[in-house]
Amino acid sequence: MQSGLLAEGVSDTSQEMFQLIRKLYPICRSITGDGVRETLKILQEYIPLTIHEIPSGTEVFDWTIPKEWNIRDAYIKNANGEKLVDFQKCNLHVLNYSLPINKKVSLDELKAHTCTLPERPDWIPYRTSYYKENWGFCLSYDQLSSLADGEYEVFIDSSLQDGHLTYGEYFVKGQTDDEF
């Protein structure tokens, strides 16, 4: 563990929780996909989860299980080939549930597919597009404002296809047989 991340005298449980969070944080996960499965597998090391999967298209009350989304890589490059945005460095940079894309776009088109938080100019927002097929990136407002006119290469290596919604169930035995 890096020194200085936790105060002296912090309990072992707190240290373990912190290490678990450090392990889980980098995993890109959404409501479906391999990131959810990877997260649940790690959590199974700590608690006995029962894993369930529901196929895409299944109706559950007033909701339909969406297609499964997985992402492998994404970036924005400038005309010189420099990566300005890199999913491998920060998975917040991709609009969650983005469709795959690999093309060159103008700054105006890029801006039309970019989410920012002008009121928090140095924050990268978390945005999703579960129910409207689209592609996009999330940048800090400052970073977007610094982009010059020109052509940009946008690349998102993702898939959106029939699959499953995966979830974990953990049963905590109580003092009565009631369940909620």
What feature does the model see in each segment?
Residues 1-180:
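N-terminal hydrophobic/helix-forming segments and targeting peptides
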